[in-house]
């Protein structure tokens, strides 16, 4: 499983990547496009059952499931037209199986926001719009080809043109491809959808990046998190609360130190563990 970590510049993508992989490889700087070429890291999936089995069999040999994370360059408006690092950004996402969308849910002027203020819904819509526009071009081109082939009497092409046009209309309304009512019983639809590799057809996990204080207070007092959580629920997606900076700070802690830290915070598991498991 390969997951792309995406989000607007300065929302905490590289900080989160550093914490996930327990490295300092991804330069986390306070300016856009700090991550230009994607950083890649492979991490094991936490599994208490595996630890228990190793204890029972008295062995140190464990082979956990692994997840590959890719830190992808920050996005700006116009990426679908090649603005900023748009072409590179979209190409990197296309190579991933799923998306971890990091959304800024913390206030503060020490870290600049490219739009000047914190608004997670606007930020999500900015990225979604660019991904949808990219998908729309792919679907429109294929629909046109199928419609042209259908004029020669190709019934299969005509059928494809019909559902592709419906998908084109769906995307044109600003909706993600993953919410399109695909006919799973139609092998041709399923195959073509897979061939197109649409960006918005990929599963998404929202990582709500907030302050350590908000995590300690139970997140109920953070309206930004509540907004993202509702949006994710409406989409049928997951929303994981996380403090990327704190996770980076404790990345090198021993298991015992992390356990003590979690107890002090009043939480059962780190946001990173929850994110990796959700992947």
Give each language-model segment a name:
Residues 41-46, 73-83, 94-155, 170-186, ...:
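Conserved Switch II/interswitch segment of TRAFAC-class P-loop GTPases
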Residues 2-6, 11, 17, 145-279:
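C-terminal-of-GTPase-core extension/linker across diverse P-loop GTPases
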Residues 15, 52, 126, 138, ...:
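Alpha-helical scaffold segments in soluble metabolic enzymes
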